[in-house]
Amino acid sequence: MTTDELRDQQYAKTLQRLIRMETVSVAGDRSTEKFERFHSLLRELFPNLFEKSDVENFSGSLLMRWPGECSEKPILLMSHHDVVEAVGSWSHGPFSGDIEDGKLWGRGSLDTKCSLWAMLQ
């Protein structure tokens, strides 16, 4: 297996772990436990980011400031990790993280745990 294939395989496994975390956001539900579990997984997967950042946790959300060392203007990277309810029938479970024919299936694979993962990677 090539280095690129190994890297792609590792990336897929990491993203699968994010997809498999159920983070459904329901109107009126103020509980944050599932989001706190997701944050714990992020801390495990991206320890350097959490060590080097100022992290604020509020209402199930994270605000992270990573101080820079240059005089350039700051940038903003923004994403979300909640997903909508999984209703209807699914060919793959909504939180399965299945990979079939090179495609990763599950809530958040497009909107938007994938972009969050890419930013943190």
Residue ranges and their predicted role:
Residues 1-117:
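Acidic/His- and Gly-rich active-site-bordering loop/insert found
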